[in-house]
Amino acid sequence: MGRTIENKQKIVTELKSLLDDSEMAVVLDYKGLTIKEMSDLRSRLQTNKGICKVTKNSLMRKAIDGNSNWTDLESLLTGTNAFVLIKEDVGGAVKAIQSFQKETKKSETKGALFEGRLLSQSEIKEIASLPSREVLMAKIAGALNGVATKIAISINEVPSGLARSLKQHSEKSES
């Protein structure tokens, strides 16, 4: 039995909501994947704030219609597609997809859209090579902490330097 119009509208509304919350969309050809493999991919993506949706291209076309951030996705809407919508950890999610593809050897990345721009295969691989969100945050925190420490040392050095200068001056005056 086919889907009802109400059911299709509900799916389109859900897709629009997911797209609004997403930073990146990756389109995969899922032909040949088993249910178990799709479940494996979905669980890998959950830890990286990603979600994998399998839906008809026509419904995705309706969901992106009128949304300038996602209109370039239209060129990828052919064949059997799974849509990976990533909310936060883009690098981690792309790594999870590539790791999954390496293990199963059944799925191909058709393309991706990030910040309203289609990405090439090499750009997608570059994103996967980026450190995770947590690692980047730790590096930034370390850098900020280093700057704060240097400022504190410099601020403490001013009174100490002034005291040494005054002491030297007073010793010269006594001589």
Curated annotation (Swiss-Prot):
GO terms for biological process: translation. Pfam families: Ribosomal_L10 (PF00466). SUPFAM superfamilies: Ribosomal protein L10-like. GO terms for cellular component: ribonucleoprotein complex; ribosome. The keyword Transport does not apply. Keywords: Ribonucleoprotein, Ribosomal protein, RNA-binding, rRNA-binding. Part of the ribosomal stalk of the 50S ribosomal subunit. The N-terminus interacts with L11 and the large rRNA to form the base of the stalk. The C-terminus forms an elongated spine to which L12 dimers bind in a sequential fashion forming a multimeric L10(L12)X complex. Belongs to the universal ribosomal protein uL10 family. This is Large ribosomal subunit protein uL10. It comes from Prochlorococcus marinus (strain MIT 9515). The lineage of its organism: Bacteria, Bacillati, Cyanobacteriota, Cyanophyceae, Synechococcales. The gene is rplJ.
